[in-house]
Amino acid sequence: MSMLCYTLIIAFLIGTWAAPKSEDNVPLGSPATSDLSDTSCAQTHEGLKTSRNTDQRHPAPKKAEDQELGSVANIIVDPKLFQKRRFQSSRVLFSTQPPPLSRDEQSVEFLDNEDTLNRNIRAKRENHPVHNQGEHSVCDSVSDWVIKTTATDIRGNVVTVMEDINLNNEVYKQYFFETKCRNPSPNPVQSECRGIDSRLWNSYCTTTQTFVRALTMEGNQASWRFIRIDTACVCVIIRKTDNF
């Protein structure tokens, strides 16, 4: 019985050694290995071609700086921002061309036209000084439409003011009508007000500011904010105490 078991074991081992070897155990340089190498190379080559074609169809994304510059240069604004009348101001104008300035005692009127967003506003500004029947201003001032890039908001923070906006595929500029003293001087003596009795009063002309709603940038979105602009040149008088 034991001899029969030994005979079966020996026959099993001989059959195992004589069986063909699998691809995993094929030695290097054999035909099977060559076929596998050729197949792997072909698949790798196809993968490279596919990746190159994919790169051509989908170019690499732009740098963050380039994207930021592009967004700032072409900011698209929702027309709904201009539908609320409370956001409109006679000192803020959106136009595709520079607005006219008043000259020779003529007022400026902004009529309804295709180049102006403030179509419901008819603002009248007078250039100073105005001499009419011997009337003179206490302080000489000058007015002009200006473009602002930064300003101070109502909270005292410096904000970015939108210079150009894209609305319905049209590029508009944001203008501000500012009025300031004609010849500002840090020395109050050199900027005395006209017509003030210097024996009783010290006086000087100074530019005052007020708040207007302007379109500003908040992150990547446009929003309305109150900003400070120059609006008048006024006279400040101080009573002299030496004579009292």
Swiss-Prot record:
Entries under PROSITE patterns matching the protein: NGF_1, NGF_2
Disulfide bonds: 139-205, 181-233, 193-235
Any one biological process term the GO annotation gives: neuron projection morphogenesis
Keyword Disulfide bond annotated: yes
UniProt-listed InterPro entries: Cystine-knot_cytokine, Nerve_growth_factor-like, Nerve_growth_factor-rel, Nerve_growth_factor_bsu, Nerve_growth_factor_CS, Venom_nerve_growth_factor
Region (Disordered): 47-67
Gene3D superfamilies: Cystine-knot cytokines
UniProt GO cellular component terms: axon; dendrite; extracellular space; synaptic vesicle
Keywords: Cleavage on pair of basic residues, Disulfide bond, Growth factor, Lipid-binding, Metalloenzyme inhibitor, Metalloprotease inhibitor, Protease inhibitor, Secreted, Signal, Toxin
Propeptide section residues: 19-125
Annotated Pfam families: NGF (PF00243)
Main subcellular location of this protein, as a coarse class: secreted
Assembly description: Homodimer; non-covalently linked.
Function: Nerve growth factor is important for the development and maintenance of the sympathetic and sensory nervous systems. It stimulates division and differentiation of sympathetic and embryonic sensory neurons as well as basal forebrain cholinergic neurons in the brain. Its relevance in the snake venom is not clear. However, it has been shown to inhibit metalloproteinase-dependent proteolysis of platelet glycoprotein Ib alpha, suggesting a metalloproteinase inhibition to prevent metalloprotease autodigestion and/or protection against prey proteases.
Protein name: Venom nerve growth factor 2
